[in-house]
């Protein structure tokens, strides 16, 4: 049985919502075990609450060592100046021991993201994230254009061939759209199908 981990960081809940729909897509594939976890918050709780961070998220916090237990990992992060959030970077910077052992070599790595604006760095966030995964020897999987949501021209929407994305709005008031959530589900299903093939 293939094991898929959806691992995310979410400040205000947008990436959390996307992660839940990626899990939904992955769980639609028979014979795949799907786990949802998040990386630790690095901002002190009182300070995080004061700036509106959603600190009470249901997903348990992951540990670095458990990454080796999965056949595929789908990472989710908000964008920080065109890169992954510092919380995700801090977590991944602790994976040197896994790198030394080659523990993630040959496993699938995939990424989804959230940005504040339509051109806020969603693609650079995902492609720069890929660098870390490639150093670990992971096999990168995105979202193919077989996913019809990628060519939706009827609305302002996230979604890239590199991975699912959502646009949160500059003030965070916009929630993931139906199209963005469809792309997220597609990504989860696509990764799970490939993980199942590789694990068999």
From Swiss-Prot:
GO CC annotation, single: membrane
PANTHER family reported for this sequence: FLAVODOXIN-RELATED PROTEIN WRBA-RELATED, FLAVOPROTEIN-LIKE PROTEIN YCP4-RELATED
Flavodoxin-like domain ranges (all copies): 4-191
InterPro entries assigned to the protein according to its UniProt record, in alphabetical order: Flavodoxin/NO_synth, Flavoprotein-like_sf, Flavoprotein_WrbA-like, FMN_Rdtase-like_dom, NQO
Amino-acid positions noted as binding FMN in the UniProt annotation, renumbered to this chain: 10-15, 79-81, 114-120, 135
Taxonomic lineage of the native organism: Bacteria, Pseudomonadati, Pseudomonadota, Betaproteobacteria, Burkholderiales
Entry superkingdom: Bacteria
Keywords of the record: Flavoprotein, FMN, NAD, NADP, Nucleotide-binding, Oxidoreductase
Protein's name in the database: NAD(P)H dehydrogenase (quinone)
């Amino acid at each position: 049985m293939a094991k898929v981990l959806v691992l995310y960081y979410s400040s205000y809940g947008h990436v959390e919502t996307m992660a839940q729909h990626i899990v939904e897509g992955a769980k639609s594939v028979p014979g795949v075990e799907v786990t949802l976890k998040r990386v630790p918050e690095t901002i002190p709780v009182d300070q995080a609450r004061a700036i509106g961070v959603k600190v009470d998220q249901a997903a348990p916090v992951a540990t670095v060592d458990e990454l080796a237990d999965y056949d595929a990992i789908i990472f989710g992060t908000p964008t920080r100046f065109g890169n992954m959030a510092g919380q995700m970077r801090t977590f991944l910077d602790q994976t040197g021991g896994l790198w030394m052992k080659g523990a993630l070599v040959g496993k699938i790595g995939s990424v989804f993201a959230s940005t504040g604006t339509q051109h806020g760095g969603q693609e650079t966030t995902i492609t720069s994230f890929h660098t870390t995964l490639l150093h670990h020897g992971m096999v990168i999987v995105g979202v193919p254009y077989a996913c019809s949501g990628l060519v939706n021209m009827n609305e302002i929407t996230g979604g890239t061939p590199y991975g699912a994305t959502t646009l949160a709005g500059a003030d965070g008031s916009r929630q993931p759209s139906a199209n963005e959530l469809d792309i997220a589900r597609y990504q989860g299903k696509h990764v799970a199908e490939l993980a199942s093939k590789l694990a068999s």
